[in-house]
């Protein structure tokens, strides 16, 4: 089983993440940000990851530090749990619709951190969650996991639907890219490392 526990404490946040890549989609999420908890739950459920996230942050300021730092710690947990990445599929693209919204997420478990994000969101907030933090979370996650991540809105207008489709698609794409393919011998790269 590919598992990891990661803790990170700063003056702004105290984050704990427990991850099992080869899980069943069980989750226990408590960040103090209701909408973000919902999104992380969807991510775990649809990615079939067992995920526990406990976060305490300076929410009296805003949600930015907590959301970004969860992305950092979650990215570190995936990096640790993925291990040597032998025999993984490596690439995946997943489309997820939610009503009028259609989002495409493409991942390369490459060791080369990069984020391309084209998610125009009309609402400034969903609940107490600032929507600009979606991109901050994705960037922190991609850079700390060391993956290339492309996230694009193809259609849609409702910010809640767009964000929800994004987290579901990210979970599905990572599930596929991290799957073990017995046909792949060793590292899935001509360089010999990822």
Curated annotation (Swiss-Prot):
GO terms for molecular function: imidazoleglycerol-phosphate dehydratase activity. Keywords: Amino-acid biosynthesis, Cytoplasm, Histidine biosynthesis, Lyase. It is an enzyme of class 4 (lyase). Its main location: cytoplasm. InterPro entries: IGPD_sf, ImidazoleglycerolP_deHydtase, ImidazoleglycerP_deHydtase_CS, Ribosomal_Su5_D2-typ_SF. Pathway: Amino-acid biosynthesis; L-histidine biosynthesis; L-histidine from 5-phospho-alpha-D-ribose 1-diphosphate: step 6/9. One of its GO terms (biological process) is L-histidine biosynthetic process. It comes from Thermoanaerobacter pseudethanolicus (strain ATCC 33223 / 39E). The lineage of its organism: Bacteria, Bacillati, Bacillota, Clostridia, Thermoanaerobacterales. It catalyses: D-erythro-1-(imidazol-4-yl)glycerol 3-phosphate = 3-(imidazol-4-yl)-2-oxopropyl phosphate + H2O. Pfam families: IGPD. GO terms for cellular component: cytoplasm. SUPFAM superfamilies: Ribosomal protein S5 domain 2-like. It is found in: Cytoplasm. Its EC number is 4.2.1.19. Belongs to the imidazoleglycerol-phosphate dehydratase family. This is Imidazoleglycerol-phosphate dehydratase.
């Amino acid at each position: 089983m590919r598992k990891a526990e990661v803790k990170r404490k700063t003056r702004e946040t105290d984050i704990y993440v427990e991850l099992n890549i080869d899980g069943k989609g069980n989750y226990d999420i408590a960040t103090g940000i209701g909408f973000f908890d919902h999104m992380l739950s969807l991510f775990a459920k649809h990615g079939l990851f067992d995920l526990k996230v406990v976060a305490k942050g300076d929410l009296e300021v805003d949600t930015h530090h907590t959301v970004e730092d969860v992305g950092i710690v979650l990215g570190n947990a995936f990096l640790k749990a993925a291990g040597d990445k032998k025999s993984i599929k490596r690439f995946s693209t997943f489309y997820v619709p939610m009503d009028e919204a259609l989002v495409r997420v493409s991942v390369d478990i490459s060791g080369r951190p990069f984020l391309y994000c084209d998610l125009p969101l009309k609402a400034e907030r969903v609940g107490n969650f600032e929507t600009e933090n979606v991109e901050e979370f994705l960037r922190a996650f991609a850079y700390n996991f060391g993956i290339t991540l492309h996230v694009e809105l193809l259609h849609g207008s409702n910010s809640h639907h767009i964000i929800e489709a994004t987290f579901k698609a990210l979970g599905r794409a990572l599930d596929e890219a991290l799957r073990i393919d017995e046909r792949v011998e060793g590292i899935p790269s001509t360089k010999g490392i990822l």
